[in-house]
């Protein structure tokens, strides 16, 4: 008798995705981040659901409702801080996941890669709208500054901004619609993640060597289920350590001041995970140019597969490309630091140089080094 997990229509999908899935025998811990992102998403949806039961999306009561959650709701404080810090861990996993893809040439699966880029944009939009909901000073001014960037779009810009705001400034209508979108987007993210997996399972996973692994596959369960369980344990350990010991470490103190349209904070800045893009935005004097650079900083990933010049897939055996990759990582850390600094000398010039270097590495240096490595190997 055939096992029910191989015959039942629903069980078969789960079986082919998580149990009998043929996986390369040599994938490292860098391949854990897909499952960790899934766990992050589940944590965010569950904690968000419980927060939404007590939150009110009205400008007069939003801030108070968050205070009420932390003070009066049973374990409300832990749910709120798990949600806030869960977002930070979500982005850490996202950046490491994308970095893994860049390093090992996983972008050579174009459908999976492009869905991944759409996922990244969607998660960033979700996180931005979530940051507005507590209606603190940084929530309000962050929403004002970032939505205002759309006014740089020629001809329709101003109308577009007022349409998004639902009025002539960030107000009650804006908060209500941001809450609506923040609630629905994670479910769209879940659907996109399923499509991401669907495309991945069409080709099978890449592996550190970049060589096709069809001749050496192992079943996903028990090998990688156990490996993913260890990753999940470490992720939850990191999250709970952050939540229970320093829940406000990654937040902005200004967000504990209720939103006041008449008082601008000295330094308006987004959450830490957007600082690199914010630094690129600020490094260009023109408003429209800055907005374009901001969008390009992420969408540039879409043309990475077209710029792959090396005869090898990953960077495992390409020391020159490895140097460039780690230079890119250092550059992104520099941009993150600059994004949190005031707009004054020497931060302006450092930000501009780091922004130029970011695009130069991805668009010029990496393809050029790929060609050089081919010629060094006489390929």
Curated annotation (Swiss-Prot):
Per its Swiss-Prot or TrEMBL entry, what cofactor is needed?
Answer: heme b
Q: Which residues cross the membrane?
A: 33-53, 77-98, 113-133, 178-198, 226-246, 288-308, 320-340, 347-367
Task: Mention one GO molecular function.
Answer: ubiquinol-cytochrome-c reductase activity
Q: Where in the cell is it found?
A: Mitochondrion inner membrane
Write down how the cofactor binds this protein.
Binds 2 heme b groups non-covalently.
The membrane topology noted for this protein in its Swiss-Prot or TrEMBL record is:
Multi-pass membrane protein
Name the residues that bind heme b b566: 97, 196
Q: Which PROSITE patterns match?
A: CYTB_CTER, CYTB_NTER
- Pfam families attached here? Cytochrom_B_C, Cytochrome_B
Q: Name one GO biological process term.
A: mitochondrial electron transport, ubiquinol to cytochrome c
Q: Give me the residues that bind heme b b562, please.
A: 83, 182
This protein's record includes keyword Cell membrane: no
Going by the UniProt record, its keywords in alphabetical order are: Electron transport, Heme, Iron, Membrane, Metal-binding, Mitochondrion, Mitochondrion inner membrane, Respiratory chain, Transmembrane, Transmembrane helix, Transport, Ubiquinone
UniProt: a ubiquinone binding residues: 201
Q: Which domain of life is it from?
A: Eukaryota
From the UniProt annotation, give the residues forming the signal peptide: none
A GO CC annotation recorded here is:
respiratory chain complex III
Q: Could you give the subunit structure recorded for this chain?
A: The cytochrome bc1 complex contains 11 subunits: 3 respiratory subunits (MT-CYB, CYC1 and UQCRFS1), 2 core proteins (UQCRC1 and UQCRC2) and 6 low-molecular weight proteins (UQCRH/QCR6, UQCRB/QCR7, UQCRQ/QCR8, UQCR10/QCR9, UQCR11/QCR10 and a cleavage product of UQCRFS1). This cytochrome bc1 complex then forms a dimer.
Q: What else is known?
A: Heme 1 (or BL or b562) is low-potential and absorbs at about 562 nm, and heme 2 (or BH or b566) is high-potential and absorbs at about 566 nm.
Q: Which family does it belong to?
A: Belongs to the cytochrome b family.
Explain the purpose of this protein.
Component of the ubiquinol-cytochrome c reductase complex (complex III or cytochrome b-c1 complex) that is part of the mitochondrial respiratory chain. The b-c1 complex mediates electron transfer from ubiquinol to cytochrome c. Contributes to the generation of a proton gradient across the mitochondrial membrane that is then used for ATP synthesis.
The protein depicted here goes by the name Cytochrome b
């Amino acid at each position: 008798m055939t096992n029910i997990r191989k015959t039942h229509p629903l069980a078969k999908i789960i079986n082919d995705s998580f149990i009998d899935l043929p996986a390369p025998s040599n994938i490292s811990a860098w391949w854990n981040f897909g499952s960790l992102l899934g766990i992050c998403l589940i944590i965010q949806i569950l904690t968000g659901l419980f927060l939404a039961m007590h939150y009110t999306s009205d400008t007069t009561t939003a801030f108070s409702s968050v205070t009420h959650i932390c003070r009066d709701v049973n374990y409300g404080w832990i749910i709120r801080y798990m949600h806030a810090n869960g977002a930070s861990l979500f982005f850490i996993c996202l950046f490491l996941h994308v970095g893994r893809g860049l390093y090992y040439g996983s972008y050579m699966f174009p459908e999976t890669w492009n869905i991944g880029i759409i996922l990244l944009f969607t998660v960033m939009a979700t996180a931005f709208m979530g940051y507005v909901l507590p209606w603190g000073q940084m929530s309000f001014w962050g929403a004002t500054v970032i939505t205002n960037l759309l006014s740089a779009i020629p001809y329709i810009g101003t109308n577009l901004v007022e349409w998004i705001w639902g009025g002539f400034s960030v107000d009650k209508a804006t908060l209500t619609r941001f809450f609506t979108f923040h609630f629905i987007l994670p479910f769209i993210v879940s659907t996109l993640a399923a499509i991401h997996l669907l495309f991945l399972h069409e080709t099978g996973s890449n592996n550190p060597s970049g060589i096709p692994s069809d001749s050496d596959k192992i079943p996903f369960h028990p090998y990688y289920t156990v490996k993913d369980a260890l990753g999940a344990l470490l992720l939850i350990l990191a999250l709970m350590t952050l939540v229970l010991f320093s829940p406000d470490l990654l937040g902005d103190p200004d967000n504990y001041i209720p939103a006041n349209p008449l008082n601008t904070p000295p330094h308006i800045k987004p959450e830490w995970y957007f600082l690199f893009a914010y630094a690129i935005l600020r490094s260009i004097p023109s408003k429209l140019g800055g907005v374009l650079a901001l969008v390009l900083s992420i969408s540039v990933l879409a043309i990475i597969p077209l710029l792959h010049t090396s005869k090898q897939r990953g960077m495992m055996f390409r020391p020159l490309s490895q140097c460039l990759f780690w230079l890119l990582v250092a550059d992104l850390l520099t941009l993150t630091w600059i994004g949190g600094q005031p707009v004054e000398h020497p931060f302006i010039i450092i930000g501009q140089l780091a922004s130029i270097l970011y695009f130069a590495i991805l668009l010029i240096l990496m393809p050029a080094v790929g060609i050089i490595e081919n010629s060094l190997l006489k390929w």
